[in-house]
Amino acid sequence: MARLLTNAASARVARMPVRELAARISSMRDALDSETARRDFEVLQSHVNGARRFDIVGVAISTGGPNALGRFVPLLPASFPAPILVVQHIIPGFLDGIVKRLNDSCEVAVRMAENGQQLEPGAVYFAPDKKHLTIARTPQKKIISKLSDKPEGLLFCPSADVMFKSMAAVAGSRCLGVIMTGMGHDGVE
């Protein structure tokens, strides 16, 4: 019976005009992307608002990043209780536009990270092109950003591995790492 239903569905798709099929596939992909972004946000929110409080959140994103971020970041309230760092693998020169577009359409402040900048809750900080983004604590226990081109020789700069290792060293169990999209192994070490 299942095979008959599959064959019937295949026959309907085969007779469907290409434009209509493309439009249906596109709308299903958009619905799936929106649902995925909503679920990702709910998981993140449950972790951040749960019994455990995070001092810092890091997001690694690559292929499909601008679209995923465009669905995810607008869901964050201005009252989000931790700063969020983002490493986006993208062709140099495109990141400024993404940051501006997100900042203009979100409740949270979205900006490019600067060296030595105090990281504030309710703000998203992107690693600039060709700079690793790490964090440090000041003597007053504030978290600040550090930008560097070291270590050299990595496939990706900025590197999610470098960011996540820094977060773990500084915040320990009070950090949360999120890998949203991509390819390769950056961020899984």
Residue ranges and their predicted role:
Residues 1-189:
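Conserved acid/base catalytic micro-environments in cytosolic active-site loops
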